[in-house]
Amino acid sequence: MKKIVSLIFVILMIFAAFSSTGCGKQPYLIAITNQSKACLEVYDITEGRMDETTLVWSYKLPYNNIAGVKFRHSDVHGDVVLTVCGNNYGCMVSYPAGEIVWSTVSTAANPHSIELIPCGVIAVASSDGDEIRFFTTEKQYNSKPSASVTLDDAHGVLWDEESDVLWAVGGNILTAYTVTLDSDGAVTVTEEVSLRTEIPTNSAHDLAPVYENTDELWITTGSTVYRYNKSTKAFVYDYEGHEGLDISGVKGIGSYDDGSVVYIYPDGEYQSWTGKTVYFIKEGVGEPMAITSESGHFYKVRVFDTRYQ
């Protein structure tokens, strides 16, 4: 009964989030990793707040140090949320019910990013393990890797539906892989060497879609925020609105169809890599709005959207 009541509450909150923005206008939803509470949280930041009145959904994890989150649609399970945390844990849960549909305790050390590939394979990038591991989803619990590739300081993975490749960042490298799952359950991963390139600055950290331009990717490093153009292979720094992103240490970033940008960087109050404030740039231009929460310390922020691009 409690689970049914909770599910009804989540559905009502989602409806309220859409209603509050007016007819035909989509709310600005974010998913964020609350490391101080070991929770995934989804907020509607349309009104510039992160509190109990704008909390849409939350999910408690069994381990601390939640590092990555993605919202995707699975042909098998419907809408799902994927996350990695602890030293070697990853899972995929149904949304909004929060039921585990896949999990593993076999990522490489310090997992940072996770992605659901449409063929049914899950990729996990781990920074201390210098590795991306690939898992099939046929086993619900304690899934073991079916393939792996080496990438120094692996921090981000993102599927590209247009090019049918998995983009990945680590160290000062951006590269991409084809991933296939055959009828026998074997996973084959091949690096697309022609897409491998050096990032101009070191310590690549986040990799995210630019929803308003599918030919671009967000890439953050220890010192800079880039928009990478896939066609020209250019790391663009002086894009429109870059003045509001002229900062170092951005841990998570994303943008909406209208160009609005959300990002987070550390304040060091809880951990050296977490912060209490999400920054929001309306339509990508102007000064960022600081949206501070008093109930958590966060690491990664994501635009809450099932689309890959």
Regions found by a protein language model. Give the residues of each.
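Loop/turn-rich, solvent-exposed surfaces of beta-rich toroidal or solenoidal domains
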Residues: 201-278
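Repeated scaffold domains used in trafficking and secretory/extracellular systems
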Residues: 63-74, 108-117, 151-159, 199-212, ...
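Short loop/turn segments immediately following beta-strands, especially the blade-tip
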Residues: 44-50, 136-141, 178-187, 229-237
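Blade-loop segments of beta-propeller domains
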Residues: 53-91, 95-115
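Conserved beta-strand positions in repeat-built beta-propeller and related beta-rich domains
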Residues: 31-36, 81-87, 123-128, 166-172, ...
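Short coil/turn segments that connect the beta-strands within blades of beta-propeller domains
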Residues: 26-28, 77-80, 118-121, 162-164, ...
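Sec-dependent signal peptide cleavage junction
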Residues: 15-27
